[in-house]
Amino acid sequence: MDGMDVSKYSAASFNYTDVGATKGPFPAGYHYVERSRVVGSGLDDFVAAADALMRWDMHRGAGLKIHSSEDSAVPDAVVVLTLGPIRIPCKVVYVIDEANRQGFAYGTLDGHPESGEELFHVDYSPTDGTVTAHITAFSSPGRWYTRLGGPVGRRVQALFTDRYLTALAKACRSPR
């Protein structure tokens, strides 16, 4: 997609050891992020938010360019996000496909500015119709410049977490 050959990243290794750890307790030694936001209401909003999430539109809405081996997030899909000259390679670790929860986690590959994993999911509450987006991540600096930049990297991560949640809210017909 989008002109970049992502096949060279298909054989790239994860640049962290705790692959899949967003399924359980966070491993020690990382910075942690947990954010949630009500993004809509009703089943139509859930479907719209889940589609935006799974088809990379959340990332596009946050201002990133997408280069992916797949049109949507599926296990082992490689996605290289670009922000100007910065390449941010990731691979989908697992997908959540439940009636009231949709999402995926991806892990950082060699060459990513950070090391770690990020889980994105959208939940629908049949009780009250609330659609809530969740972002959970653990990371540490993965390159010399992110180690040197320290707090700047955390601010950038917080900025993009907010942008992701806003993009999912905008995907809904009754955004909050």
Feature annotation, model-predicted:
Residues 1-83:
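Hydrophobic ligand-binding cavity/cleft-lining segments
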Residues 5-6, 10, 141-176:
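A conserved amphipathic terminal alpha-helix motif
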Residues 35, 135-137, 164:
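A structural signal for short, well-ordered beta-strand segments
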Residues 50-58, 97, 111, 127, ...:
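Short, intrinsically disordered, mixed-charge
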Residues 75, 100-105, 131-136:
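A short hydrophobic beta-strand element
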Residues 77-81, 89-90, 133:
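Conserved active-site beta-strand-loop modules that form the wall/rim of enzyme catalytic pockets
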Residues 84-128:
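Hydrophobic-ligand binding "helix-grip"
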Residues 109-155:
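Beta-strand/loop substructures that line and gate deep hydrophobic ligand-binding cavities in soluble
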